[in-house]
Amino acid sequence: MRHLESENGSIFQTALVFVRMNKPTIGRYKMKVSSKAIVNGEFEDKYGKRGNQFSPSGMPSYSIPFEIEDAPEGTKSFAVVLEDKDAISASGFVWTHWLISDLKRTSVAENESISATDFTQGANTWASALGKFEIEEASFYGGMAPPNNRHRYELIVYALDTVLDLPRGFRFNELYFAMQGHVLDSACVVGTYDMCGGVCLI
């Protein structure tokens, strides 16, 4: 794990650390994450814009389930990031759909985002200049809604040797820097979603 020396480090340094933090460790441990929301490589309709559960302002809110297996010894909590790097083609930046910190169990059921009280949720990218949602409404799962074509969504789980104690509504950068030096292992599962019922031309 590489640490940034200062917030004014070069773009290359920042990007390098970002990639390393988000690349699942291979061979060191055997932690795995899986989700029954993914069927034949695609997230089911109900977890995004083709579903039928939304926040008051229209954000898809029916959250995905997932299970973690073989976490390393010494794990005190998990941090979870659901992100869409393909959003760069439409918005110019990675879109974060779900942020979780201080998860102390190895499974989360579907639609738990709206009711769970034993883990902390951060603000997703629906709370941004583009999304324009208030942080409170966006501090839950914000489902998939790719505007241009089929996107790939990565569910990344980090096993940590500490509890982060971040406040509700934390941002990705706060989670990212709080995890520095505490990641024991990571695991990732990928599924796709589109707005054309799986028959997109692209």
What are the residue ranges of the model-derived segments?
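N-terminus-centered regions that define maturation/targeting leaders and the start
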Residues: 22-202
